[in-house]
Amino acid sequence: MYGPKDHGWIEVVAGPMYSGKTEELIRRIRRAEIAKQKVQVFKPEIDNRYSKQDVVSHAGDKIQSVPVKSSKEILEKLLDDTDVIGIDEAQFFDDSLVEIVSKIANNNRRVICAGLDMDFKGEPFGPMPKLMAIAEFVDKIQAVCMVCNNPATRTQRLINGKPAKKSDPVVLIGAQESYEARCRKCHCVPR
């Protein structure tokens, strides 16, 4: 999506783990670069699974990013000539991300946020619900359920091969060994 320079907007790519959110973010950023637009990509500093510096998809696609400690730091590190801003793992930021993203879009810039819309409990995750509400464009993508192969909309956390309990902490960064994509029917959160 490219538009006139006098319009900004917000795009959100949401879904469970292994649905291709980061791949889609990278694809959109690369297309903006092809369109000769200046881009910057940000990610939360706590996301260091595959790289401390780059945004990396589970499939191995990667793009250079600026790791930040807080959403406010995005404004501090945002360059004046940037046209398109990518934000990966948006769910890990606090609610001030919503105001910051709005401010950036109101300054005639395109903002693309990617993140989990629900936590492992199946509940709205961080600022994602509000970002989805204010965005001009929302793509909710699915993965494949690792149990029944139907479309998956949820992320199942596994601890020693068993579903995590509702009382477990929400934030625990991991990869395949601790998470699976699941459909509504196969998703399980014991009390």
UniProtKB/Swiss-Prot annotation:
Pfam family, one: TK
Gene: tdk
Protein name: Thymidine kinase
EC number(s) on file: 2.7.1.21
GO term, biological process aspect, one: thymidine metabolic process
Keywords: ATP-binding, Cytoplasm, DNA synthesis, Kinase, Metal-binding, Nucleotide-binding, Transferase, Zinc
Coiled-coil annotated residue ranges, if any: none
Any one GO molecular function term: zinc ion binding
Listed Gene3D superfamilies: 3.30.60.20, P-loop containing nucleotide triphosphate hydrolases
Binding site for ATP: G15, P16, M17, Y18, S19, G20, K21, T22, D88, E89, A90, Q91
Organism, scientific name: Clostridium botulinum (strain Kyoto / Type A2)
Reaction equations catalysed: thymidine + ATP = dTMP + ADP + H(+)
Record keyword Transferase present: yes
Places the protein is found: Cytoplasm
InterPro entries: P-loop_NTPase, Thymidine_kinase, Thymidine_kinase_CS
Main EC class the enzyme belongs to: transferase
SS bond partners: none
GO CC aspect terms: cytosol
NCBIfam families linked to this entry: PRK04296.1-1
Main location: cytoplasm
Assembly: Homotetramer.
